[in-house]
From Swiss-Prot:
Species: Homo sapiens (Human)
Compartment list: Nucleus; Chromosome
Protein name: Histone H2A-Bbd type 2/3
Chief location category: nucleus
Tissue expression summary: Present in mature sperm.
GO cellular-component term (any): nucleosome
SUPFAM superfamilies the record matches: Histone-fold
Amino acid sequence: MPRRRRRRGSSGAGGRGRTCSRTVRAELSFSVSQVERSLREGHYAQRLSRTAPVYLAAVIEYLTAKVLELAGNEAQNSGERNITPLLLDMVVHNDRLLSTLFNTTTISQVAPGED
């Protein structure tokens, strides 16, 4: 008996499938639509591929998770209950890769470091 192929995205019985956002499809927490809007409003390029906002949202989510993980570990080690801007600044400057990435970034409420 031949198998019937289901159409991609259909939920059967001729009905439409549930719509699924690009953020959900990519399994991200950061909104792909928000990233795309920021890219378009910033006029960074004349054209924008469909995958560029997805990729950038994934990179931003990864960097945020990494910084928060390091700051959370540092907060636990120092006996603090909250992640403060000072902890974020310290974590970014103590990590070699993050330090080179954010070397020109100023974190609000933190005095500039003396190098």
